[in-house]
Amino acid sequence: MSLHRSQHEEFENRPDELEREEMIPRPRRKSRKKTIFFWILLILVIALGIGGHVLHEHYLNARKAADSVYAPNSVKKQRDVDRLLKKGKPISILLMGTDTGALGRSFKGRTDTMMVCVLNPKDKTMTLVSLPRDALVAINGYEQYYPSKLNSAYAYGGSATAVKTVQKYLNVPIDFYATINMGGLEGLINAVGGVDIKPLLSFSFAGYNFVKGKKTHMDGTEALQYCRMRDQDPLGDYGRQNRQRQVIMALAFKGVQLTSLLNDDFLNSLSKQLRTDLSFNNMVSLNMKYRVATHHMKSTHLQGTTQVIGEADFEVASRKNKQEITDVLRKALDLPHAETGDTLKGTDLESPNQLEGTGNSNDATTSTGQTYQTYQTPQYQGQY
C-alpha cells in the first residue's frame, strides 16, 4: 500500500501557522488518528537527551526525570534493541494514551489511543500507524475472553500484554513502548508558560471565545477547552483531532526550546505523565541518531468495519487491510515481507462477512457456527 499525499501528513510548518484546509481528514468511521502522542514522546526524548547531554549542570535533573518514567515490562524482546540503537537501525515504538477523563485515573484502565511509530534514520522518515481502539482482537494470554477490544489489552495485563497483542495481531516486532497520561496535558502547557495558537475556526466554548486566524496565547486550561469542543465543528471529531494536534505541536515547539529544557518544573511535570521502557541511555541514543527521522512524517491507519457482536460495537479489519498495514510497518523497519497475524489462534475470523451479532443472544456467533461469550469489560490489573 503506497502512502501518497492524501494518506500521510508532513509537519514542517510552525504550529501556530497551520491552515485549516491543510488538515481536512480523509473519511473514515470511528477511527482516531491522534499523532499527538508521538510529539509528547519526542519532547521527552529531546528534553531529557539534550538536557543531560549538553548541559552537565542539568544532568542529574534530566537523569532523575528519565529514571522516574522508566518502567520495563516482562516482554522478551523479539530483536536485539541495544544493537539496533547502536547501529542506528529502524526501531518501532508502541504509543499508548490513557485519558483520565473525569475518573481521576492515572495510567490505569483501557487505552484511549494506540499507535505504532517507526523511526527510520536512514530514510529520514517517521511512520505512524493508528490502530482502532475497538479493533476486534484476541488479547494475548486472555484468549478465553474473546471477543475483545484492542484497548482492553492494557487493562488486562499492562504494557506487556498490549505489546504482545499488537505483535501477534500484525506480525510486527515492537521494540519499545510508551504510555502517556493525557490528563496531565494542562500542567505541561502551564510549565512552559503557555502556547501560541491561531484557532482553526471561530467558536465559543466553556467561557472562552476563539477567533479564527487570530494568534492567541493560551494557558493550559484555555488550550484544553480549545481542544475539547466538537459539536460546533463542521468536521466533528476530526476537527477536534486537528485542534489537539495543533496544540501538541505548539507544545512540542515550545518544549524543545532551551528555556524549557532548563525548566525543572517542565521536566518534573513531563516525568509524571509518561511511562516507557526506554532507558535514559536509550533516549540519548534516540536524540543523537534518530532525530533526523522526524524530517518527514507519514501517517495512516488500520481501517475496520463497525459490527455489533454480543451487543458491543467492534471495528473488524479485513485480512487485506491488516496485511497492508503489516506491509507498511515491516517496510519501514527494513524487514522482509511476512503474512499479517491472525485474530484468534490461527483461525481466520477477520473478514467482516464472517462475524455478526446473533440478535437474540448475548453471544457472538461466526458464520461457521462457533459461539463466543459476550464482550466483558476488563478489570484493570494494576500493571504498567
Predicted regions and their residues:
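Non-catalytic, solvent-exposed segments at the cell envelope interface
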Residues: 2-384
